[in-house]
């Protein structure tokens, strides 16, 4: 009897849960021909102030709209395991618990538009792994926290329009960065896109939303704005201006530079990897492995100036587990950029110490043993820019790279660049299975503690490794170049012109021509040029771009090994005959011009001086030849008509006229008789 009562109670409860519809809601069941179906529940009673607790468990779509529900309690829908659509639009919801959507693992669409939310529990998205649409339109949300970015990855539609947002986290759009690199699964289907609604918010246009501003200016992107015609509210100079017309002056996405893309190193050696970045604001640099894990090696990072930052990672005593990709990621408010370098580890390591090493004093460096095939000379020490330091750097483009090396051959007649002193080798490591050796040498530093290593790629100089910094010097001292066993002899000049020269040599190795490196420089200069790999041939190389009539020094050495005296040659380029004839023609033209112009100038000067000296007598002579009107003087006393009109002598009239016009003539006449006035009476 008791068992039957309990059974009836359980059945009645299950029946109420499965089939009972809340009194303030309406429930509809839509069946299909295959016997399956879906249940729709609609609750829009204006008097409803809380979420009912007895929805049918097979509900697939629940709509609670236009009610006065103000709060979503914890686990409000936990038993609706088949729920796919939850619409809570145009209510009065002001708060949501973190666990309000617990157990809604099949939910595809969540709409909370038209409520009074000031915040959303973003962590609750973990309880809804299949959620694709989240509508928070027309609420009072004022900010999106930085931690929300990690939960947005699975969303395909996010509507935050008509809220109170002024800015967004810098990494907001990075939530969907995987879509930019993931190719489409099939050519018949378009790539997956994200719909993002951000319009009708009082945006403050600065670097924090620079990515959104740039997004509004492009059309083909994985993330599509629901309304690209968004406007700025602040600052005042951007107020009312469309995102598409805003130009932010101090926002620059980082650019990352690495001096090599592939590094091959011996097992147990040390490698330095360097990364340089520029951007505004000044970017932050992080190193990660290909699997996303952080790097557990010493990392040095420094910002020498605003907008510039570099970072160095030291891989000491590397093993095969250290091989792989190393990513340098630069990040600031304007965006993220990264560069990748691949490290390859080869060989096995055995350390060989000379028999008399124990007899030396602790402070005395060990003696270096000559290597076979190298003529017993001391291997040069070379200062390289990291990464590399164990092999010749590999560049993405085949363009020639300019770098400065410090060599240490024995004294010879070579130019001063080949006479620098270097540190001796302290350890020799043999690589099993290969006839190669690794010489661990510290880079040579100039007085003052600064290294002269530098590289120029594609015409752009990379800065030195800031060797003045103690930490960086400590890392540089651990670097080691790798020397391959290639014997080169009989280096000679096969052909030379005014602008190029062809070098030939004999090699006892069966390796390809790419196993050697050709360096050259103008005689007496310190900057060495690396010959382009495209100019290499079988045991020969062509150096182009030389100056006619100049002296150069060229060296051929195995890749990763510095130049030696016996592998270098001095040559001079031919003089261009055409240039001499041009100079001769120019000299003839100049001489002819001087012969013609100089006498003409002298003649003109003579004429000018002559005119200046003869100007006064010339004018006096002209005045004397002029004809003047003769004047008669009337006497004030009574005279006869004959006497009154009696003409005076011509010379006296002329003298009277000149006396009234010229002071000089007046003085002369006064001395000789004066200007007498004659009266006839």
From Swiss-Prot:
It comes from the Eukaryota. Disruption phenotype: Viable. Retinal anatomy is grossly normal, although thickness of the INL is reduced. In addition thickness of the innermost region consisting of the inner plexiform layer, ganglion cell layer and optic nerve fiber layer (IPL, GCL, NFL), is reduced. Optomotor responses in dim conditions are impaired. Electroretinography shows completely absent b-wave response under dim conditions, and milder abnormalities under bright conditions. Abolishes ON-responses and delays OFF-responses in retinal ganglion cells. Rod photoreceptors show normal morphology. It is a single-pass type I membrane protein. Residues 606-681 are cytoplasmic. Disulfide bonds join 275-328. Detected in the outer plexiform layer (OPL) of the retina, where it localizes to rod and cone ON-bipolar cells (at protein level). Also detected in bipolar cell bodies in the inner retinal layer (INL) (at protein level). InterPro entries: FN3_dom (IPR003961), FN3_sf (IPR036116), Ig-like_dom (IPR007110), Ig-like_dom_sf (IPR036179), Ig-like_fold (IPR013783), Ig_sub (IPR003599), Ig_sub2 (IPR003598), Leu-rich_rpt (IPR001611). Residues 350-391, 425-464 are annotated as: Disordered. This is Leucine-rich repeat, immunoglobulin-like domain and transmembrane domain-containing protein 3. Residues 1-19 form the signal peptide. Plays a role in the synapse formation and synaptic transmission between cone photoreceptor cells and retinal bipolar cells. Required for normal transmission of a light-evoked stimulus from the cone photoreceptor cells to the ON-bipolar cells and ON-ganglion cells in the inner retina. Required in retinal ON-bipolar cells for normal localization of the cation channel TRPM1 at dendrite tips. Seems to play a specific role in synaptic contacts made by ON-bipolar cells with cone photoreceptor pedicles. May also have a role in cone synapse formation. Residues 254-344 form the Ig-like domain. Its main location: other. The chain crosses the membrane at residues 585-605. One of its GO terms (biological process) is regulation of fibroblast growth factor receptor signaling pathway. It is found in: Cell projection, Dendrite; Perikaryon; Endoplasmic reticulum membrane. One of its GO terms (cellular component) is cell tip. Glycans are attached at residues 18, 296, 485, 506.
């Amino acid at each position: 009897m008791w068992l039957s009562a309990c059974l009836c109670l359980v059945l009645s409860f299950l029946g109420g849960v499965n089939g009972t519809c809340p009194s303030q809601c309406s429930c509809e069941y839509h069946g299909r021909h295959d016997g399956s179906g879906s249940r729709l529940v609609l609750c829009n009673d204006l008097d409803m102030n809380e979420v009912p607790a007895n929805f049918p468990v097979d509900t697939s779509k629940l709509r609670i709209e236009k009610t006065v529900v103000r709060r979503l309690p914890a686990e409000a829908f936990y038993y609706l395991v088949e729920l796919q659509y939850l619409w809570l639009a145009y209510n009065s919801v002001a708060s949501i618990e973190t666990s309000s959507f617990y157990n809604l693992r099949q939910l595809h669409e969540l709409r909370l538009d038209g409520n009074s939310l000031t915040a959303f529990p973003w962590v609750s998205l973990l309880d809804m792994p299949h959620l694709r649409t989240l509508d928070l339109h027309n609420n009072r949300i004022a900010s999106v926290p930085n931690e929300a970015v990690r939960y947005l990855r699975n969303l395909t539609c996010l509507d935050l329009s008509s809220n109170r947002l002024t800015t967004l986290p810098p990494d907001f759009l990075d939530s969907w960065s995987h879509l930019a690199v993931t190719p489409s699964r099939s050519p018949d289907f378009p790539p997956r896109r994200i719909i993002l609604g951000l319009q009708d918010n009082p945006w403050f246009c600065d670097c924090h939303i620079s990515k959104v501003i740039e997004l509004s200016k492009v059309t083909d992107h994985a993330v599509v704005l629901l309304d690209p015609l968004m406007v700025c509210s602040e600052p005042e100079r951007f107020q009312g201006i469309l995102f598409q017309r805003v130009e932010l002056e101090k926002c620059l996405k980082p650019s990352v530079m690495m001096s090599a893309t592939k590094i091959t190193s011996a097992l147990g050696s040390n490698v330095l990897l360097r990364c340089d970045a520029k951007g505004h604001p000044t970017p932050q640099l992080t190193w990660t492995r290909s699997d996303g894990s952080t790097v557990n090696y010493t990392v040095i990072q420094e910002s020498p100036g605003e907008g510039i930052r570099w970072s160095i990672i030291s891989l000491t005593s590397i093993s095969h587990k250290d091989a792989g990709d190393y990513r340098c990621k630069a990040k600031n408010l304007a965006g993220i950029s990264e560069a990748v370098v691949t490290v390859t580890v080869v060989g096995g390591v055995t350390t060989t110490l000379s028999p008399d090493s124990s007899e030396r004093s602790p402070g005395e460096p060990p003696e270096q043993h000559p290597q076979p095939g190298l003529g017993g000379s001391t291997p040069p020490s070379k200062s390289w820019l990291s990464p590399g330091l164990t092999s010749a750097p590999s560049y993405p483009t085949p363009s020639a790279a300019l770098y400065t090396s410090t060599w240490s051959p024995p004294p010879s007649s070579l130019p001063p660049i080949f006479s620098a002193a270097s540190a001796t080798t302290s350890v020799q490591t043999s690589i099993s299975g290969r006839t190669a050796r690794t010489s661990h040498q510290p880079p040579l530093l100039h007085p003052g503690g600064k290294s002269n290593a530098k590289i120029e790629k594609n015409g752009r100089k990379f800065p030195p490794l800031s060797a003045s910094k103690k930490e960086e010097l400590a890392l540089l001292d651990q670097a080691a170049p790798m020397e391959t066993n290639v014997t080169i002899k009989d280096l000679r000049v096969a052909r030379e012109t005014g602008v190029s020269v062809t070098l030939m040599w004999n090699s006892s190795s069966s390796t390809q021509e790419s196993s050697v490196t050709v360096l050259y420089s103008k005689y007496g200069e310190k900057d060495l040029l690396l010959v382009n790999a495209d100019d290499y041939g079988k045991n020969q190389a062509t150096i182009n771009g030389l100056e006619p009539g100049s002296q150069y020094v060229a060296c051929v050495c195995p890749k990763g090994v510095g130049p030696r005296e016996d592998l270098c040659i001095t040559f001079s380029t031919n003089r261009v005959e055409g240039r001499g004839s041009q100079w001769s023609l120019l000299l003839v033209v100049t001489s002819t011009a001087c012969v013609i112009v100089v006498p003409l100038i002298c003649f003109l000067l003579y004429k000018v001086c002559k005119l200046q000296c003869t100007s006064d007598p010339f004018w006096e002579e002209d005045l004397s030849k002029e004809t003047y009107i003769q004047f008669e003087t009337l006497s004030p006393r009574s005279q006869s008509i004959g006497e009154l009109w009696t003409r005076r002598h011509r010379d006296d009239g002329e003298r009277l006229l000149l006396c009234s016009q010229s002071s000089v003539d007046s003085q002369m006449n006064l001395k000789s008789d004066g200007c007498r006035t004659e009266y006839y009476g």
